[in-house]
Amino acid sequence: MRGKTLLAPSLLSADLMNMQSSILSLEGEHDWLHVDVMDGGFVPNITFGPGFVGALRGAFPDEVLDVHLMIEQPSRMVDAFITAGADYLTVHAEADHHVHRTLSRIRENERKAGVSINPGTSEEIIRPLLPFVDMVLVMSVNPGFGGQTFIGTMMEKVTALARWRAALGLSFLIEIDGGVGRQNAAMAARGGCDVLVMGSAVFGTPDPASTLREIRNIVEEADERA
Ligand code: DX5
Ligand code: ZN
C-alpha cells in the first residue's frame, strides 16, 4: 500500500522579502520545504544558492529541505548543498554526464538522492539508476518558473516508474513538480505521485495554511481510495 501523499510547498513562490514569515504562514501544515536552485544556464532563471539553504537550515532545524538543483554539472555543487544542510538533493539527468557518481556521492554523505527529468526526457533514461535513488522527480512543466500549466501526459511517466518500482522491489518516492494544485492533486495522488510540489497554488493564495489543509483533505481521500 502507498504511504500518505506528502505536500512540499515551493519557496520559489514565497514572498522573497519576507521568507521567514512566508514559511511560518504555512503553520506547519506542510511536510517538506521545496527549494528550487537555478543557475541561469540549465534553466532561464537564477534563484537560491547554498547560502540560502544554510540560512533555512539554521532558522528551521527540523524542516525537511527538499533541494531541487536545476543547474549544469551539479556534481560541482553537491558538496556545498550537503554542507548547507539539504535533506533531499535532486539532480537533473540531463545536466550531468555521470549521474550515478553524483547520486552515490549524495548517499555517501547520508542524504537522500533524487534524480529528475524534464518533460522532454524519457523515463527510460533513468531506468538504470532506479536502484540508486531515494526519489524520482518528474517535471510536469519546463523548469524555470512557477505558475505554469501542468502537462498531463507526464503522468504516463509516473505510471511507468511506479510499475518498475514494484517490479524491481524498490521503494524510491515519486515526486511531481509544476502546475500542481487543488485542481489536480487528487488525480496526481491517485496516479502514483508520493510527493506534490506546489508553488503558486499555495503561496499565491491569501491563506497558505488553509489552502494546504484543503489540499491535505483532497489527497487523504485519494490515498484512502488508492
Ligand atoms: C519550476 C520549479 C517548481 C516551481 C513550481 O521550475 O521546479 O518547483 O516552484 O511552481 P508551480 O507549483 O507554481 O508550478
Ligand atoms: Zn522544483
What is each residue range found by the language model?
Residues 21-26, 75-83, 121-133, 178-196:
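Catalytic cores of alpha/beta
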Residues 34-50, 141-149, 206:
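Glycine-rich, proline-tolerant flexible connector loops at the mouths of alpha/beta enzymes
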Residues 5-10, 33-35, 56, 65-69, ...:
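Hydrophobic faces of well-ordered beta-strands that scaffold small-molecule active sites
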Residues 59-63, 108-110, 165-171, 220-226:
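Short helix-capping segments at alpha-helix termini
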Residues 1-13, 20-21, 223-226:
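N-terminal amphipathic alpha-helix/helix-capping segment at the start of soluble metabolic enzymes
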Residues 3, 15-18, 76-80, 86-173:
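Conserved anion-binding
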Residues 106, 189, 204-226:
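C-terminal helical cap(s) of enzyme catalytic domains, especially alpha/beta-barrels
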Residues 43-74, 185-202:
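A short alpha/beta connector and helix-capping loop motif
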